[in-house]
Structures are given as C-alpha cells and as structure tokens.
Amino acid sequence: TINYNPQRTRFRKQHRGRMKGISYRGNNICFGRYALQALEPAWITSRQIEAGRRAMSRNVRRGGQIWVRIFPDKPVTVRPTETRMGSGKGFPEYWVAVVKPGKILYEMGGVPENIARKAISIASSKMPIRTQFIISG
C-alpha cells in the first residue's frame, strides 16, 4: 500500500478554494500506454484513490504496471458532531487531491488493451466523477 498522507506540510489547515477551469498540468500520458482521465472537477479522497488502485491491480495481476498520477495534498477539516458554530476551524480529518477536468488519475502499461479497458472501467466506478479511457499515441 502507498502512504497517501504528506510527510510534512507547511501549514496544518488550508482554505477550501475553488476548482475553476481545466487542468493544464498532468494531462498527458507520461508513463504507461493507457490512462484514466477526469472529465469533471472534484476532490478525490485518499481512500478513493487507494480503492481504485487496488481494483486495477487486482484485475491486471502480474505483468501490468500501474502509476497513480494524483496525490492527496490538501487537508480537509471536520468539526466534531453536535458542536456549535464558531470557536475556530475544525481539525484535519482526511486528505484530498484536487482534480480538475483533463487531469490523468491512473496510468497503466504492459497489458493488452481489453484487459486495461476492463481494469480501468472498474477503477472509474470507484471515482466520484465521470472519467474517460484514453490511449497514448
């Protein structure tokens, strides 16, 4: 398993920000032959990333290689239940990756196209957004 929390960050809490526009970086296939590309903006949690990676690796078995192209580096804070408003921001609860349209989530290589298509479609069903399967070249 991959550790999906940053080792150390400069600040413990972040603003939520907003996801405008499209992804200009990380939208080309760099490592593999097939890839899963996001079509919508979203926050993708570290658990969702890991679930997608596991689903893919279970499908390709040996021979295939998988690259995860996103990393959750944004802390999301949650305040305790039944707490009144005010008294500061909540505590960091989990990490998310900010994904914009066009961003490549996973890449895969070393397997035939039909197996890659099947594995990536299973991984895409774990994602909270619409995605598309793309082939390099």
UniProtKB/Swiss-Prot annotation:
User: One biological-process term from Gene Ontology?
Assistant: mitochondrial translation
> Could you tell me which InterPro entries the record lists for this protein?
Ribosomal_uL16 (IPR047873), Ribosomal_uL16_bact-type (IPR000114), Ribosomal_uL16_CS (IPR020798), Ribosomal_uL16_dom (IPR016180), Ribosomal_uL16_sf (IPR036920)
Ribosomal protein: is it a keyword of this entry? yes
Localization, per the record, is: Plastid, Chloroplast
The question of whether Protein transport is a record keyword is answered with no
Q: Which UniProt keywords apply?
A: Chloroplast, Plastid, Ribonucleoprotein, Ribosomal protein
- Family membership, please give it: Belongs to the universal ribosomal protein uL16 family.
Q: How does it assemble?
A: Part of the 50S ribosomal subunit.
Question: What name goes with this protein?
Answer: Large ribosomal subunit protein uL16c
Which organism does this sequence originate in? Vigna unguiculata
Report which gene this protein is encoded by: rpl16
